[in-house]
Every structure is written in C-alpha cells, then in structure tokens.
Curated annotation (Swiss-Prot):
Residues 678-693 have a biased composition (Gly residues). PANTHER family: HEAT SHOCK PROTEIN 70KDA. Keywords: ATP-binding, Chaperone, Chloroplast, Host-virus interaction, Nucleotide-binding, Plastid, Protein transport, Stress response, Transit peptide, Transport. This is Heat shock 70 kDa protein 6, chloroplastic. Disruption phenotype: Variegated cotyledons, malformed leaves, growth retardation and impaired root growth. Defective in protein import into chloroplasts during early developmental stages. Its main location: plastid. Interacts with geminivirus movement protein (MP). InterPro entries: ATPase_NBD, Chaperone_DnaK, Heat_shock_70_CS, HSP70_C_sf, HSP70_peptide-bd_sf, Hsp_70_fam.
Length: 718
C-alpha cells in the first residue's frame, strides 16, 4: 500500500499501525510494522469521474483537458425560484420574460430581513414586522440564525455571545435556540425554514402561481453539514430544493448572464455573517469556478459587534454599568451599531443617540456620542486584515496573479463599507465593479440557475468546485485527504479498504472536512460503520468505499464488498445535522403551523370582510330610508344584528354563514325598489352613491328602441 493510504481506527481496536508493504508510517518515513489492530485502505487510482452523469465539453481556450458539466435535472412547466437565504436579509427571484427578476415581498420591499419572532400570545412574526419589535422582545426574536445552521455548540462560542436570545446545546452538542414565549427550543433549520416559507409565499403571490421548487444559495465556504442543514431547512419549509449553489457562483451567473466576452473575475462576497472569495472564468455561457476560499466566521455582524463593544465599554467606564448583560439594551446597541455602520458608508461621522438605555437609583441613563469613520475603521482594523488571506489563497489556488483578473465583483451589503472597498483596491490593484446590486445579485443568479433547471434558460454550463477537502482520520490523529479542495463538482473517489485483524467483521471510519493537518482542527462530518464483513484473515477482505460529492456540494458514502458483491449499509452518525426522523417531525409541525396560520389569516380576513358588510349595509339602510318597505327592512336589520353577534363571538364559518344570510336579504332591497311604481324597470335601483333614480325629468328619455333621446336637465333635489 502506498504511503498515502489511509489507516483507520478499527471498531474496538487497540491502536493504529501502518500496513504498507514498504513498512512506511503516515509521514512517509520508514518504520517498523506494529502488529496492532488497524484498518487500512489503498487508493485505487486517480479521481474517477462518472462520465454517464456528465456532459463532455471542449475547453473554451482550445487544447487542454476535457471538462465536464453536470447534466441538469429539468423541471417542465413549473416555476422554480432562486433564493438568497442571507444572514441579515434574504431575497427571492424568478425568471420573467427571459430575465431574472427580484420578487417584491408582501410589504413591497425587494429584500426581507432574516428575522423570526414569537410574541407572548404565541403568534409568529417573520421579516420586517419581526425586526421592528426586536427591542421590546429580544429573547424571542431570532436573527443571524445562518451563523448557527449545521454547527455544533463548540463551533459557535463567539457567535452565541452576539445575540440577544439564548443559544443552548442539546444532548448531541447540537445548537438549539431557546424561545421562552412558547417554551420551545428550535433548531436553526426550523427558524431558517420559516424565513424560506415567507419568501416562497411572497413569490407565489407575485408570480400568481404556487411555488414548490427552489434553488437556494449558501456561502461557498459552507461545509457539508451546513449545506445539508440548509437543504433540510428547505424541506421543512415544504420546498423541493433542486440545487444548492454557492453565493459567489450565483453572483457570477447574474453578472455574466448577458455577457459574451471571456473574462476572469474575482467575486468578493462579504455578507452579514460570512466571507467568500471565488475566482471564475466567465464567457460564452460557461461559468467555471477555478478556486474558492473564505471565512464563515467573518461578516457584517462582526463589524457591528466591534461598535457594540466600544459603546458598552465607554458606558461602563463612565457609569459603571455593563450593558451587555441587559438583553434589551444589547438589542438597542446592536441596532444602533448597524445603523451607524450604514451611515458611515456615505458620511465621515454619525451621531449615536440612545436615550433611556438603562436606569439606576439616580435616574435614567442615556448614550449620546459621535462615531467617526476613522474610529470605526480603527475598531475593525483586525477584521479588515482577515479579509486579505482568503483573497490571496483563492488566487494562489487558481494559479493566477492579480494582473490576470479582469473584474472584481463586490457582493454582500458589507462591501459598501468604504474601508472594505479601499482594501479591495489595494489588494487587487483593481477598481471594484459596482454595476451589480450587492443585495440582490445572488438571488438573481440563483434564479438563472433555477431557469436552467426549469428549462427556461439554455446554453449555460456551470462548473463549481468543492471548497474544502474531504478526508479520513488516520494514524496519530492525522487527517489524510481523499478529495482535495477546489475539485470540480460533481466528483467521485474510491478507496479500497481491508481489515487489520483476523476475523474482523466491522470497522468504523471518521470522515473529516477541512484543510488542517490534524483531526482536532478539522470539521468531523460524522462516522460510518461497515458491518457484515465475512470473517477472514487480516488483509484479505476487499471493501470498496466510494465518496461522492454531488452538484450541491453534499457528500454521500457507499461501500461494496468486492469479494461477495454485497452492498454495505452505511449510516453517518455524529454529524451536526438533524436526524431524518427529526426533520420529518419538523416538516409535519411546519405543515401544521402553515395550516394554523392559514386558518388565522382566514379568520382575520373574514372578520374584516364582515365589518365591511355591516358598514355598507347600515349605510344603505340610512341612505334609502323610507324607500325600503318595512317588512324587508325588518328582515335585513334582523340578519344584520345576527352578523354583528357572530363577529363578536362566532366562529369563522358562522360569520361566513351570517354574511351569506344578510347578503340574501340585502338583495331583496333592490328587488323591492324595482317593483315600486316609477322605478324605471330593471335598470333602476339605488345608485352607487345610494340615491334612487329620479323618476321625473328622466322620463323624457325614451327607451333603447331607436327613438330619439332627449337630453334632460337635472336639478339637485336637496
């Protein structure tokens, strides 16, 4: 076995050992074979790409190796939307008239805050309405949830301190968000699903068509667990997620949608919670990602946090009070910091006024200060420095220099910060391209990909890459990489493993994702166990383990015993994603909530309609007065009172029945007016303003039988 072969811990084994025929250990140096229990594997060759799943294409530049593109799964005659599920704001877009178009939400806005709240009465609020009440309901208002999705508790220590709600761990060390208002703990996927549900409902109204399929974007540097969790969120929301697409890649699709010239572009994506850099070749409908890099712990929230900490420190120095321990004060500080950051994009200084931020025995306390752009940049200087490394890494991985870059595309609201734009100029030597809207371009690109899958867009080929390496835990707690980062997707890699102990029937393998050398520094995607291996001398069984990464960047693992042809069942355990049964339960809960929400909305709409009917009926009775026969009027008034009673205490259906009964009686008013002498036939009756038709002067008009029509002068009878 080659020195790069993986040695894996055996289930119940007592240690690790190299089993290379050259007796090499994992660091490639000679060593003595230790007869301990070990599980080892041998690479079967270079990366194998299943050509049946791809469309072979020639390169644009001529020569070189052939490239592959995934054959899209097309959805016929059904609207597929593109969704940018952001940390701070989200957006949805669709192909309209052959072009990607942003969908406006129910409030008339083009983006929706990624905020969900629960009131004390148990009502759920999503979007702008949830954001508005955050200050008075900080512990039940969930924002920046994207920073927790698909993560373990030990991965979000810093992020959990930046929010006003409680972030707790469950028995599996997964992140849960506590909601005191309804006494429930939510997974991040559930909260994200509620944002997705609103976006899709808004899209359905905008497009006048039910939407059930979507393409959802994620940061390019999201790992497998985070991608899977995002897909689960879509499923909980009742969506079929056709594709998970990287945000910088989506931005490039929107940027290059109508462009024919070949360009090499660098997409600089600094959002609310994550930072990505991707280098792509774009042109002639081909979008090839050359490399990607990033930092999922860096975003606009971190810039806000620096301002919050500065304000809190200054206040504590002056007043001796720690505002960070006050949830309501923390929420006010966070909103003020975000507002100041936005204002400093166009101003050199901004006033920060927070009256009644807290109170002591001496009375209320206020914050009144000025933040300059220079001070803001000083507070965030180390964050700006962290931006450099991913940019340099992405170019190095793409084997390009800055002079090879034609355009630098800025994506994400945080790229509006002048210091960020200046840093991009210094690092790349290019003037950033600001022709795209940084808040909308990702959703527009997702809509283009949705159009490709729906068959609305043709002649576009997308070649994306895996952002992080996939590997296995090997001797000495070392990670041995199997699929390196920036491998074009989809991809497949096989390893042949065998046993290291006589009669061994099962093994356990720890799957990792990351770039660090040691297991402890990388993300564990979970472990899988191979059972049912026929008892045999060590080294005899041949188990082929296949690692597949699909077009969504999501990993799956399968195994086959080459000796018997038997396919082994593999279950991934220990991953920071939700178990299938828990996702199914959340889907059912979401459906139940959707039904409850629909019933509540129906009740509100019915009550509003009933109030309107009562008003219009009372108005008509008053305006027509004595013209209505007494018997008819009594019946209408009786039904009117019944409807009023039902509005106060009846069910939705009872209100609807009472409205129908009242409308039936109101129709008799018109009938009785038609039957009165001089009513003028079927065309007579109450006018829109409630006045009856005049029977005097209008009689000079002859019917519609071809006789002359005489103009009549009308006088106001009042």
């Amino acid at each position: 076995m080659a020195s790069s072969a993986a040695q894996i811990h055996v289930l119940g084994g007592i240690g690790f050992a190299s089993s290379s025929s050259s007796k090499r250990n994992l660091n490639g140096k000679g060593g003595t074979f230790m007869p301990r229990s070990a599980f080892f594997g041998t690479r079967t060759g270079p990366f194998s790409t299943p050509t049946s799943a791809f469309l072979r294409m020639g390169t644009r530049n001529g020569g070189g190796a052939s490239r592959y593109a995934v054959g899209p799964v097309r959805v016929v005659n059904e609207k597929v939307v593109g969704i940018d599920l952001g940390t701070t704001n989200s957006a949805v877009a669709a192909m309209e008239g052959g072009k990607p178009t942003i969908v406006t939400n129910a409030e008339g806005q083009r983006t929706t805050p990624s905020v969900v709240a629960y009131t004390k009465s148990g009502d759920r609020l999503v979007g702008q309405i949830a954001k508005r009440q955050a200050v008075v309901n900080p512990e039940n208002t969930f924002f920046s949830v994207k920073r927790f999705i698909g993560r373990k508790m030990n991965e979000v220590d810093e992020e959990s301190k930046q929010v006003s709600y409680r972030v707790v761990r469950d028995e599996n060390n997964n992140v849960k968000l506590e909601c005191p208002a309804i006494n429930k703990q939510f997974a991040a996927e559930e909260i994200s699903a509620q944002v997705l549900r609103k976006l899709v409902d808004d899209a359905s109204r905008f497009l006048n068509d039910k939407v059930t399929k979507a393409v959802i974007t994620v940061p390019a540097y999201f790992n497998d667990s985070q991608r899977t969790a995002t897909k689960d969120a879509g499923r909980i929301a009742g969506l079929e997620v056709l594709r998970i697409i990287n945000e910088p890649t989506a931005a490039s699709l929107a940027y290059g949608f109508d462009r024919k010239a070949n360009e090499t572009i660098l997409v600089f994506d600094l959002g609310g919670g994550t930072f990505d850099v991707s280098v792509l070749e774009v042109g002639d409908g081909v979008f090839e990602v050359l490399s990607t890099s990033g930092d999922t712990h860096l975003g606009g929230d971190d810039f806000d946090k620096r301002v919050v900490d500065w304000l809190a420190a200054e206040f504590k120095k002056d007043e001796g009070i720690d505002l960070l321990k006050d949830k309501q004060a923390l929420q006010r500080l966070t909103e003020a910091a975000e507002k100041a950051k936005i204002e400093l994009s166009s101003l050199t200084q901004t006033n920060m006024s927070l009256p009644f931020i807290t109170a002591t025995a001496d009375g209320p306390k206020h914050i009144e200060t000025t933040l300059t752009r220079a001070k803001f940049e000083e507070l965030c200087s180390d964050l700006l420095d962290r931006v450099r490394t991913p940019v340099e890494n992405s170019l190095r991985d793409a084997k390009l220099s800055f002079k090879d870059i034609d355009e630098v595309i800025l994506v994400g609201g945080s790229t509006r910060i002048p210091a960020v734009q200046e840093l991009v100029r210094k690092v790349t030597g290019k003037e950033p391209n600001v022709t795209v809207n940084p808040d909308e371009v990702v959703a527009l690109g997702a809509a283009v990909q949705a159009g490709v899958l729906a068959g609305d867009v043709s002649d576009i080929v997308l070649l994306d890459v895996t952002p992080l390496s996939i590997g296995l835990e090997t001797l000495g707690g070392v990670m041995t990489k199997i699929i390196p980062r920036n491998t074009t997707l989809p991809t497949s890699k096989s390893e042949v493993f065998s046993t290291a102990a006589d009669g061994q029937t099962s093994v356990e393998i720890n799957v990792l994702q990351g770039e660090r050398e040691f297991v402890r520094d990388n993300k564990s995607l979970g472990s899988f166990r191979l059972d049912g291996i026929p008892p045999a001398p060590r080294g005899v069984p041949q188990i082929e383990v296949k690692f597949d990464i699909d077009a969504n960047g999501i990993l799956s693992v399968s195994a086959v015993d080459k000796g018997t042809g038997k396919k082994q069942d593999i279950t991934i355990t220990g991953a920071s994603t939700l178990p299938k049964d828990e996702v199914d339960q959340m889907v059912q809960e979401a459906e139940r909530f959707a039904k409850d929400d629909k019933e509540k909305r129906d009740a509100i709409d019915t009550k509003n309609q009933a109030d309107s009917v009562v008003y219009q009926t009372e108005k008509q009775l008053k305006e027509l007065g004595e013209k209505i026969p007494g018997e008819v009027k009594e019946k209408v008034e009786a039904k009117l009172q019944e409807l009023k009673d039902k509005i106060g205490s009846g069910s939705t259906q009872e209100i609807k029945d009472a409205m129908a009964a009242l409308n039936q009686e109101v129709m008799q008013i018109g009938q009785s007016l038609y039957n009165q002498p001089g009513a003028g036939g079927p065309g007579a009756g109450p006018s829109p303003g409630g006045e009856g038709a005049s029977s005097g002067d209008s009689s000079s008009s002859k019917g519609g039988d071809g006789d002359d029509v005489i103009d009549a002068d009308f006088t106001d009878s009042q």
